Amino acid sequence: MRATEPPTQSVGAYAAVHGPVEAADRIRAGCAPPAVLAEVAQPEPDLRDDLAALEAGHARLLTPEDDDWPNAAAHDLAASGTGAPLGLWVCGDPQLGVLTAGPVAVVGSLAASPYGEYVAAELGQGVADRDIAIANGAGFGVEAHALRGALSTSGRGRCLVVLACGIDVGYPADHGPLLREITDSGGVLVTEYPLGTKPRRTRGYARQRLVAALSEATVIVEAGRRSPALAVARTASRLGRRVYAVPGPVTSATSAVDRTTERHADQAYTWLISSR
């Protein structure tokens, strides 16, 4: 995980065939296929800080051999050619209940309108009231309001946040208290990026595929045509997950839709009304 930049389709497939130890030995020796070597950074990374953090209990490293590994999500990502994670750094509930209880991803615009913020919070609370977890990347706007809506349900709300950085980085910085409240309330923070990894745009897009894969359904509350949230919808659709789009004002740029979200808008309206 230290030597690669997700998504790593070739390295993941190679490790699945040979096992991680033998795969690493072959990569070190330079005898792995060119596609695998192209996904590996040089020189070999220093793992001492990672091992110290694991020993101290600051985080948990989940691997495909663990009972808590999200097998369905990893399998679907690998089968679709999207790239399954090699492992997951986790902070929060050690039982990872939210990973196995079919979360609903609620995502959307960072610059949400008051309408979008209200609907996101209502969805978060309504889903949490049914003992279903909310999943997203804890971004500003729609995502943060959905998480806060879930947390407002008398401690019942559980959240799964997929980070585009190391588990110890705390990004967005303004959401430090929110992330701590999530882990204190039985939720989890998950990332495929090692400790200390800084966020950047490409990692944000790579993260979206995990949000989609770990969720049973995705709801787009508001999103412009270039919104990163639409990457979640497209991946979810590609993986065969349900995708919904909340109808919004036709005059609003954050209620723009593409073909992926447009065909699901009526379903989202029906789902939204029935969940109230």
Regions found by a protein language model. Give the residues of each.
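Short, small/acidic-rich helices and loops at N termini and domain boundaries
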Residues: M1-D76, T261
